[in-house]
Structures are given as C-alpha cells and as structure tokens.
C-alpha cells in the first residue's frame, strides 16, 4: 500500500478567479485546489466486515508487518486515523525499514495536524528508499501547504523523474506552475494528470482555470463543466462555472451556479462575492 491509498479529500480552498478577471486583469496569481489531493474517504474500507477480515490475517501472522500496514491503510481510507496510526506504528516496530509504512504514517500525521512528525516520516521513507515516489509526493504536498514552494516543486519533479504513474505529482506541479502564471506548463501537467486519473475532478478544474487565464473560454468552460460532472460537490468548480457565465453576461445562470457553490461551501468567499454581484439589480 502506498500513501495514495489513504489520501482523503480536503476542502477546496483555492484562489478562484475573482472579479478582477471581469475587468480583464491578469490571472497570474490565481490558482486552484491547493490541496492537490483528490481521493475520497471510503467508509467501506473501515467497515467492521473489512477490518475483521484484515484482523484475521494479522492473527494468523502477528509478526508480519505487512498485515498491519494493509489494515492501517484500510483504517485510513475509512477515516479512522487513530486506529491507522496505531497499525503503522506496529508495522514500523516490526520492520524499522518499512518505507511504505513510514510514508503512510506520515499521511495520517498530516491529517491529525502533526506536520513535524509527518515530515520526519517522509524524510525517513525516502532515506530508506530514495526511489519511492509516493513519499516525495506526500512530502511535496506538505511543503506546498507550508509555503515552501521550491522544495515542493523539487519533490514533485523528483517523483516525475522516477516515472511515477501517480496523477498527484503532475496535478501538484501544475498547481505550482499555475500560481506562477506559467499556464502553458500548467495545462500540460493537468492534461497528464487527467490521463492518469480520468475520474478526478480537480485536474479538469485546474486546467479550466489556466485555459481561462489564456482567454480560451470555450475549453475552460468544457473542463469546468466536466469537473462538475465528475464531482457535483466541488464548490470551486461551481463558482468557476458561474464566473464564466458572468463574463458572458448571463447573470441569472451565474447567480444560480454561485448559489450552488455557496450551498456546498458557505465559507467560500469568491462564490459569496460572486453571488452578491449577480443577485443585485
């Protein structure tokens, strides 16, 4: 199991396109989905039936660290983070060089808010296995959220150089390119992420924003609509769809989409501002 298997979705809190776009101002500082993580919690993985089956495997081989790593991943996918942490601890105690378990435990530490412990575990994982792409991607996400952008970029770049098939590496590097106004590079990375994870909404939303930044409104609209089709609970995508309607002068449709974005995420300020603009008059 790698770190991807226990990634959860976090709230979409990126910089959506704002009113500045409506007046034709540059988009260089805008970006989308800074979490860079687009895998849902799967409660079924943490179900009593599934855990019971995995526990039976452990009972048959209590000294096998892999059993604890697998069950820990199931707990993590089910959102049971303390139970996951305990299993990864046991896996590492049984095999101090279990680099996958370090990377998985790091992800759980991130979800529990202990970023220092997470960083230490990611560092240990890549120290044991310098070719483990999932640890570089996880550490890169940690760095990016901490504002350590160059270090984040280096980790995503390393994972890509290792020929990772994990879409997060390309998605996250694309987010960095996007935040720097390098939209052609961002579009290329988002496109690769889409080819690797065609059912993930976030790369479509990200690519749509970069298309919009390059004034390719038709492709932007198509991508953002696809993001909504894949994930109807993506508040940022609804807000971005509304922005395009607003740019086109269709205030009624814009207000409807902004309203849906606010319903999904009442704290998402770009949607709240957009709804205020389009609901007046």
Question: Can you say where each PLM-predicted feature lies in the sequence?
Answer:
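Structural signature of tandem alpha-helical TPR/SEL1-like repeats
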Residues: 44-53, 79-90, 111-124, 146-158, ...
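Bacterial N-terminal signal peptides that target proteins for export
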Residues: 4-17
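Terminal, low-structured helical/coil segments at or just beyond the last alpha-helical repeat
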Residues: 2-3, 31-39, 45, 221, ...
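Helix-start (N-cap) detector for alpha-helical repeat units in TPR-like alpha-solenoids
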Residues: 65-66, 99-100, 133-134, 167-168, ...
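N-terminal leader/linker segments that initiate helical-solenoid repeat arrays
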Residues: 17, 21-86, 93
């Amino acid at each position: 199991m790698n770190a991807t298997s226990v990634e959860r979705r976090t709230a979409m809190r990126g910089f959506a396109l704002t009113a500045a776009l409506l007046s034709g101002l540059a988009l260089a500082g805008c970006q989308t989905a800074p979490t860079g993580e687009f895998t849902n919690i799967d409660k079924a993985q943490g179900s009593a039936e599934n855990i019971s089956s995995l526990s039976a495997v452990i009972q048959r081989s209590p000294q096998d660290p892999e059993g604890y790593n697998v069950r820990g991943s199931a707990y993590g996918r089910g959102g049971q983070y303390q139970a996951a942490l305990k299993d990864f601890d046991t896996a590492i105690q049984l095999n101090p060089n279990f680099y996958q378990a370090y990377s998985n435990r790091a992800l759980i530490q991130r979800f529990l808010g202990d970023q220092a412990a997470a960083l230490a575990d990611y560092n240990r994982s890549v120290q044991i296995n310098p070719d483990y792409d999932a640890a570089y991607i996880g550490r890169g996400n940690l760095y990016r959220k901490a504002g350590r952008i160059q270090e984040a970029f280096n980790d995503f770049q390393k994972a890509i150089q290792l020929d990772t098939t994990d879409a997060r590496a390309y998605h996250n590097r694309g987010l960095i390119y996007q935040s720097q106004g390098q939209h052609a590079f961002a579009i290329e990375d988002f496109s690769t992420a889409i080819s690797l994870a065609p059912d993930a909404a976030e790369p479509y939303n990200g690519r749509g924003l970069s298309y919009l930044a390059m004034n390719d409104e038709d492709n932007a609209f198509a991508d953002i609509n696809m993001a909504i089709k894949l994930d109807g609970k993506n508040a940022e995508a609804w807000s971005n769809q509304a922005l395009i309607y607003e740019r086109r002068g269709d205030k009624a449709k814009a207000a409807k989409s902004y309203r849906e974005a606010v319903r999904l995420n009442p704290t998402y300020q770009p949607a709240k501002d957009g709804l205020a603009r389009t609901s007046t008059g």
